[in-house]
């Protein structure tokens, strides 16, 4: 295409505007090459076309004689797939619970009667009845040897987990919630949900937890459940990746992961709504609820805790709370907010240093953190215990258990000592969490944060109890009426756990419901709501978002949030022309052959190409995805009349003349309109970045076209808009992000069409 022709086709977009865009490109290209590295690992879906395709399928079914049977089949098939996913998630959770508890206890001793029993089951099924358990034996009665064995087992477990992650599935490291949130929002990454990742997550998670690292299973359980849903839907060919149905499966699977991790089906559904999906969809909620019920039902049937309960620990408090305790409860809420912000800031600082100095030494990094954690934890009873067991003891009333640890904790003469031990445990575990969560092993942060809050809460309860014992007749304690047991420290541990979890995740309703389902403490509704709301408010004032959203932002993961664009003064008034791709590779509706089309696809590997009326007018008539072009080419090759110089057309074009065209058959032209999106989404060039962000969020197309005076002047993809919004929110001078991929010379490609040599490269055209 000559320079004059290119100028004619660009007449609707004046040269001054183009010079401005080119100058921006030169000044800002570095930023987008740097920030786009994480985004490029993801593919974008096209939800608009998926909705249209599903509607077309519905129309075909409606025209069938068996439409009612087809609809019954489709509905029943959906519930069948969800039940399979829920059942598999429940069984996986059962195995995780059993294996994790055994590995955690084997560091401290073994069962003489049944080697495969953990300490709790060993004592339950032992023939010896009484306060002491003789069937469970420590490895040795020497403190130094037990210390060494405890650390050696921890090192062995973490090495196995870290090596598996490094050599088999690096994407299995960490929690996975941030990436899954991006996938649900429309940025797809099939490798993150692969069978290999699922396998490593299943095997590596119990090892990582049993190693003594301050990590939990809840976040990885969400990732594991989503990989299960993804792979089952692929086996049954139930949902196309990127479709609305696929999104619902991912949300339902993620919700079931939380449900089985906490034994909280309603909490799992709320987690899917509040944290993962970012919106309210009745169908998605019903799917999530059914999947959670299936998973928790299977877990209840398998009964991993041998108590008939699916919750980690059930609490029954004989008394209630007093209004004067709200003062102490508020302190717990403030602590939760401060804890969350402190851990997040320190964690991301450590991660920055890890990426800079330890990116090649993930296994040694995890091993070093584990050894230090084990050496310190063994010296403190509340760090040495498994975190869930420790919380179970801290949540109890003193008169409700005969556990040796709880007996010591409830001894009035040991209050000062226990307060110091809990303070040390709180501080040490907070530091451990910041180092452990970023290790290259499967790792969650829910339970470690709850354990920190529980130890701190019980410590505050002991302090409140000591104040009451010192001043029983104070005005502050009039509601106690001189009762000996007026304050229950276990309730403070419960509320502290809720506050810390809210502070780190910035969730509200989900945490309140999870705590109720987890413990059954329904008479503490008001205090729980108070501490969660206070912790979340403190966190919002200090950091705005929780650790999952902040990980998305810091790691450069793609998540388009239009509310940020709308509320940002930097993007609300900036026209979309500042960030669009203006040098486009287009397909004219006339004068194009297979030879030119294939050469263009090999030379310019984009996900799709706009189709225009002709090279001069740039009037947009449709959009062709590369996958659709490949499908049309494979079908056309089967026709006897196929040649590489055969003319292509896209529907009825008046200027072509009388030559015939057909989809495939005896003609001099082939009509590809059936493979083209004939209703692409386009906006005027005067629209702002914020408005276009809303369109991407609501409709989720793969690309939006920009028009001026009826002609195509540019396009913007979801990835490019995401980078642009981020750049503006950082108050920088913006460049055209799309030119990371599309900064090519329109003149060069069109002039080269005449000299293309056919090469059997990416496309099998021989």
Swiss-Prot record:
Q: Which GO terms describe its biological process?
A: chloride transmembrane transport; intracellular copper ion homeostasis; intracellular iron ion homeostasis
**Cell membrane is among the record's keywords:** yes
Quote the InterPro entries the UniProt record gives.
Answer: CBS_dom, CBS_dom_sf, Cl-channel_core, ClC
- Localization (cell): Vacuole membrane; Endoplasmic reticulum membrane; Golgi apparatus membrane; Endosome membrane
Q: Where is this site: Mediates proton transfer from the protein to the inner aqueous phase?
A: 275
Q: Does the keyword Nuclease belong to this entry?
A: no
Where it mainly occurs, coarsely classed, is: membrane
Residues spanning the signal sequence: none
Q: Which UniProt keywords apply?
A: CBS domain, Cell membrane, Chloride, Chloride channel, Endoplasmic reticulum, Endosome, Golgi apparatus, Ion channel, Ion transport, Membrane, Repeat, Transmembrane, Transmembrane helix, Transport, Vacuole
Give the Lumenal compartment stretches of this protein: 100-144, 189-196, 274-284, 344-362, 440-442, 508-520
GO CC, sorted alphabetically, is: chloride channel complex; early endosome; endoplasmic reticulum; endoplasmic reticulum membrane; endosome membrane; fungal-type vacuole; Golgi apparatus; Golgi membrane
Question: What S-S linkages are listed for this chain?
Answer: none
What ranges does the record give for the region Disordered, renumbered to this chain? 1-22
Intervals, Cytoplasmic compartment? 1-78, 166-167, 218-252, 306-322, 384-418, 464-486, 544-766
The feature of type site (Mediates proton transfer from the outer aqueous phase to the interior of the protein) is located at 218
Show the Gene3D superfamilies listed in the entry. Answer: CBS-domain (3.10.580.10), Clc chloride channel (1.10.3080.10)
Q: Which residues form the CBS domain?
A: 580-641, 676-734
Report TM segments.
Answer: 79-99, 145-165, 168-188, 197-217, 253-273, 285-305, 323-343, 363-383, 419-439, 443-463, 487-507, 521-543
Q: Which GO terms describe its molecular function?
A: voltage-gated chloride channel activity
The membrane topology term of the UniProt record is:
Multi-pass membrane protein
**Pfam families registered for this protein in UniProt:** CBS, Voltage_CLC
Q: Which family does it belong to?
A: Belongs to the chloride channel (TC 2.A.49) family.
- Subunit structure of this entry? Homodimer.
Which PANTHER family does the entry mention?
ANION_PROTON EXCHANGE TRANSPORTER GEF1, CHLORIDE CHANNEL PROTEIN
Protein purpose: Anion/proton exchange transporter involved in iron and copper cation homeostasis.
Which protein are we looking at? Putative anion/proton exchange transporter C19C7.11
Q: Which organism is it from?
A: Schizosaccharomyces pombe (strain 972 / ATCC 24843) (Fission yeast)
């Amino acid at each position: 295409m000559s320079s004059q022709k290119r100028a004619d086709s660009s007449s609707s977009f004046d040269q001054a505007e183009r010079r401005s865009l080119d100058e921006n490109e030169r000044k800002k290209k570095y930023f987008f090459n740097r920030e786009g590295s994480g985004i490029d690992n993801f593919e974008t879906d096209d939800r608009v076309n998926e909705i249209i395709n599903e509607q077309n399928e519905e129309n075909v079914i409606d025209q069938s004689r068996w439409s009612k049977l087809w609809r019954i089949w489709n509905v029943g098939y959906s519930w069948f797939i969800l039940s399979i996913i829920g059942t598999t998630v429940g069984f996986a959770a059962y195995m995780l619970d059993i294996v994790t508890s055994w590995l955690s206890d084997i560091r401290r001793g073994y069962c003489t009667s049944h080697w495969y029993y953990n300490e709790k089951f060993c004592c339950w099924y032992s023939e010896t009845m009484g306060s002491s358990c003789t069937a469970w034996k420590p490895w040795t009665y020497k403190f130094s040897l037990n210390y060494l064995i405890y650390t050696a087992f921890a090192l062995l477990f973490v090495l196995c987990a870290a090596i598996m992650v490094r050599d088999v599935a690096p994407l299995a490291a960490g929690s996975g919630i941030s990436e899954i949130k991006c996938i649900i929002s429309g940025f797809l990454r099939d490798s993150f949900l692969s069978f290999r990742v699922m396998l490593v997550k299943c095997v590596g998670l119990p090892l990582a937890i049993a190693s003594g690292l301050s990590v939990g299973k809840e976040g990885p359980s969400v990732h594991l459940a989503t990989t299960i849903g993804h792979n089952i839907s692929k086996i049954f060919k139930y949902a196309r990746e990127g479709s609305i149905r696929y999104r619902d499966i991912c949300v339902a699977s993620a919700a079931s992961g939380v449900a089985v991790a906490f034994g909280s089906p309603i909490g799992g559904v709320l987690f899917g709504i509040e944290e993962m999906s970012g919106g309210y969809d009745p169908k998605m909620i019903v799917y999530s609820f059914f999947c959670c019920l299936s998973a928790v039902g299977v877990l209840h049937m398998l009964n991993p805790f041998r108590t008939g309960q699916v919750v980690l620990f059930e609490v029954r408090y004989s008394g209630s709370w007093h209004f004067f305790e709200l003062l102490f409860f508020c302190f717990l809420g403030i602590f939760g907010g401060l804890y969350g912000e402190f851990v997040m800031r320190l964690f991301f600082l450590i991660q920055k240093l890890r990426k800079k100095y330890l990116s090649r030494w993930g296994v040694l990094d995890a091993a070093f953190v584990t050894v230090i954690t084990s050496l310190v934890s063994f010296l403190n009873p509340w760090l040495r215990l498994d975190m869930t067991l420790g919380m179970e003891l801290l949540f109890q009333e003193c008169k409700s258990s005969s556990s040796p640890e709880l007996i010591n904790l409830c001894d009035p003469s040991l209050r000062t000592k226990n307060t110091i031990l809990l303070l040390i445990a709180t501080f040490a575990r907070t530091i451990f969490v910041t180092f452990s969560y970023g290790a290259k092993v499967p790792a969650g942060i829910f339970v470690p944060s709850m354990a920190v809050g529980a130890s701190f809460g019980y410590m505050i309860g002991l302090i409140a109890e000591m104040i009451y014992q010192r001043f029983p007749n104070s005005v502050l304690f009039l509601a106690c009426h001189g009762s000996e047991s007026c304050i229950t420290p276990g309730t403070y541990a419960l509320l502290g756990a809720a506050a810390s979890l809210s502070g780190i995740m910035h969730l509200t309703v989900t945490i309140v419901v999870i705590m109720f389902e987890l413990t059954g403490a329904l008479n503490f509704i008001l205090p729980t709501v108070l501490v969660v709301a206070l912790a979340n408010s403190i966190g919002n004032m200090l950091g705005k978002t929780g650790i999952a959203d902040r990980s998305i932002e810091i790691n450069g993961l793609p998540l388009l949030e239009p509310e940020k664009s709308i509320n940002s003064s930097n993007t609300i008034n900036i026209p979309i022309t500042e960030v669009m791709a203006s040098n486009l590779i287009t397909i004219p509706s006339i004068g194009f052959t297979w030879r030119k089309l294939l050469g263009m696809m090999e030379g310019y590997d984009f996900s799709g190409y706009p189709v225009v009326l002709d090279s001069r007018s740039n009037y947009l008539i449709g959009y062709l995805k590369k996958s659709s072009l490949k499908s049309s080419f494979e079908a056309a090759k089967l026709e006897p009349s196929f040649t590489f110089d055969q003319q292509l057309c896209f529907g009825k074009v008046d200027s072509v003349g009388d030559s015939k065209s057909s989809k495939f058959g005896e003609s001099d032209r082939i009509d590809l309109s059936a493979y083209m999106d004939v209703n692409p989404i386009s906006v005027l060039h005067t629209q702002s970045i914020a408005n276009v962000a809303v369109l991407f969020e609501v409709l989720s197309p793969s690309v939006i076209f920009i028009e001026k005076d009826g002609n195509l002047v540019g396009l913007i993809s979801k990835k490019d808009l995401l980078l642009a919004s981020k750049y503006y929110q950082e108050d920088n001078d913006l460049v055209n992000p799309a030119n990371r991929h599309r900064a090519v010379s329109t003149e060069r490609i069109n002039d080269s069409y005449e000299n293309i040599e056919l090469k059997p490269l990416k496309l099998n055209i021989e």
